[in-house]
């Protein structure tokens, strides 16, 4: 199990609030937000921070919880965003632009992230050199260019051998509509591409290992639970799914992995540059 946090970022200018989640400490996550606001703000919240000055913002812990994966944490985060996150963008809809929870749910669209875009190598080295006087570790280097909210590899980050393909994950993969429609389209995709994943029935004792499934079952009637099947994919199969994914988010996820590979190569160049200038 991992320790996760739901947090809020407030400011002393107005009542607007940003809700987020992290598997790091909230202090580390806040440092990332501030760095993104200073560097190259792209999302609504980081532009807001940059416009008004990061010195006007503070972070507070809302909830500490044990989870098996980052996606279980995101499922909880989403409920907090709907109720409190006036500076969040929910599935393509800026919550500050709507007024009631019902409006948010009605206007809810497919969850979509932009493709990660890296600056040229010389600019990458310049940014990394300015970021710290000491030599950055590779994870610190990557964090400068890919924020936690854009790390698609968290999809595979689980303490269990399998990953519950929940509505949230299907949203992340780019499947639209209600859960039943999402699951139907996803199963067709699996069959078409000869990818076989597990289906757990309610009698499977392993269900109790998945908090996200247990949470779903709380809101189901007994007869619905008895007939329900839960999809479980191991990390290797999920990677195969990503490679063949033809939804709106497919290219963005694959582009992320290309950028990760480029950053590993860029880090080697940064290391050579740092060592050359500090010896």
UniProtKB/Swiss-Prot annotation:
One Pfam family matching this protein: GIY-YIG
Ranges in a coiled coil: none
Alphabetical list of InterPro entries matching this protein: GIY-YIG_endonuc (IPR000305), GIY-YIG_endonuc_sf (IPR035901), MSV199_dom (IPR018879)
PROSITE patterns: GIY_YIG (PS50164)
Top-level lineage group: Viruses
Residue stretches making up the GIY-YIG domain: 2-90
Family: Belongs to the IIV-6 019R family.
Name of this protein: Uncharacterized protein 019R
């Amino acid at each position: 199990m991992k320790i996760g946090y739901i947090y809020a970022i407030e400011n002393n200018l107005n009542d607007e609030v940003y809700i987020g989640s992290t598997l790091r400490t909230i202090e580390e996550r806040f440092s990332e937000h501030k760095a993104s606001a200073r560097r190259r703000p792209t999302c609504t919240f980081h532009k807001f921070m940059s416009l008004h000055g990061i010195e006007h913002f503070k972070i507070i812990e809302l909830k500490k919880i044990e989870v098996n994966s980052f996606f279980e944490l995101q499922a909880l985060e989403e409920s907090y965003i709907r109720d409190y996150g006036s500076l969040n963008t929910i599935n393509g809809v800026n919550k500050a632009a709507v007024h009631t929870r019902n409006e948010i749910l009605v206007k809810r669209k497919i969850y979509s992230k932009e493709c990660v875009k890296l600056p040229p190598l010389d600019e990458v080295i310049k940014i990394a050199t300015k970021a710290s006087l000491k030599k950055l570790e590779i994870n610190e280097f990557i964090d400068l260019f890919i924020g936690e909210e854009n790390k698609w590899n968290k999809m595979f980050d689980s303490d269990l051998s399998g990953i519950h393909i929940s509505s949230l994950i299907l949203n992340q993969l780019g499947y639209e509509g209600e859960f039943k429609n999402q699951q139907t389209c996803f199963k067709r995709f699996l069959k078409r591409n000869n990818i076989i994943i597990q289906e757990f029935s309610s009698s499977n004792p392993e269900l109790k290992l998945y908090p996200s499934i247990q949470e779903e079952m709380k809101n189901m009637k007994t007869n619905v639970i008895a007939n329900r099947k839960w999809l479980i994919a191991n990390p290797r199969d999920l990677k195969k799914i990503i490679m063949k994914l033809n939804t709106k988010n497919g290219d963005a996820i694959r582009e992320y992995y290309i950028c990760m590979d480029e950053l590993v190569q860029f880090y080697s160049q940064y290391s050579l540059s740092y060592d050359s200038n500090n010896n």
